[in-house]
Amino acid sequence: MAELLLGVNIDHIATLRNARGTAYPDPVQAAFIAEQAGADGITVHLREDRRHITDRDVRILRQTLDTRMNLEMAVTEEMLAIAVETKPHFCCLVPEKRQEVTTEGGLDVAGQREKMRDACKRLTDAGIQVSLFIDADEEQIKAAAEVGAPFIEIHTGCYADAKTDAEQAQELVRIAKAATFAASLGLKVNAGHGLTYHNVKAIAAIPEMHELNIGHAIIGRAVMTGLKDAVAEMKRLMLEARG
């Protein structure tokens, strides 16, 4: 069974800051609190439109984090150049549409193998570990292995958004099978998107899961209980699922 880690996404600290154009709340301070509360890493998504996290945030976080930085980004020349210069510990390559509220699905790795292979090589050559954000689909998982990504992050949005218990159970089986298949190919398996305090334990219980990246639910809880308690409670639930 893989060690289970929690990556805390702090994008929405920046969303709140940018809503008023102020210098607060500070994502760097939030990252420090999350680390104190048990976060194993900090995730930020530098979007092309800079709607929350900024280039400055990325630079300062890379210099100040005690744990690991996971930079989510689109596969563009601009973002690849920023990553190579900044050198986060991890880069998670994601699809991105300017009009979307949040990432809506996984990368089509199988449909753009050469582009993904080139991106993975460029990042790997810079000493960055690469993850591909994909749906729980065997074709995409095989493609991820073929293009040289050591990690995948399974998109859990369909599981999180399921309307019925039966639909959610079906999605859980699909994710678990995908995790097993990916591990059989030598890939390390992360997961994220839409995970909450109510649905995280079933995903955390999947033996192959290495890291869960969770943001919106934790930041939402933090508004009510404080960030330190919100992070600690999510980590407790995840580890409880492992017995």
From Swiss-Prot:
Site (Transition state stabilizer): 153
Signal peptide start-end: none
Gene Ontology, cellular component aspect: cytosol
Binding site for 3-amino-2-oxopropyl phosphate: 9, 20, 194, 215-216
InterPro entries linked: Aldolase_TIM, PyrdxlP_synth_PdxJ, Pyridoxine-5'_phos_synth
Record-linked Pfam families: PdxJ (PF03740)
GO annotation terms (biological process): pyridoxine biosynthetic process
Catalytic activity line of the entry: 3-amino-2-oxopropyl phosphate + 1-deoxy-D-xylulose 5-phosphate = pyridoxine 5'-phosphate + phosphate + 2 H2O + H(+)
Subcellular location: Cytoplasm
EC number: 2.6.99.2
Binding positions for 1-deoxy-D-xylulose 5-phosphate per the UniProt entry: 11-12, 47, 52, 102
One GO MF term: pyridoxine 5'-phosphate synthase activity
Recorded metabolic or biological pathway in which this protein acts: Cofactor biosynthesis; pyridoxine 5'-phosphate biosynthesis; pyridoxine 5'-phosphate from D-erythrose 4-phosphate: step 5/5
Top-level taxon of the source organism: Bacteria
Record SUPFAM superfamilies: Pyridoxine 5'-phosphate synthase
Positions annotated as active site in the UniProt record: 45 (proton acceptor), 72 (proton acceptor), 193 (proton donor)
Keywords: Cytoplasm, Pyridoxine biosynthesis, Transferase
HAMAP family named in the record: PdxJ (MF_00279)
Subunit organization: Homooctamer; tetramer of dimers.
Annotated function: Catalyzes the complicated ring closure reaction between the two acyclic compounds 1-deoxy-D-xylulose-5-phosphate (DXP) and 3-amino-2-oxopropyl phosphate (1-amino-acetone-3-phosphate or AAP) to form pyridoxine 5'-phosphate (PNP) and inorganic phosphate.
Family the entry assigns: Belongs to the PNP synthase family.
Designated name of the protein: Pyridoxine 5'-phosphate synthase
UniProt gene name: pdxJ
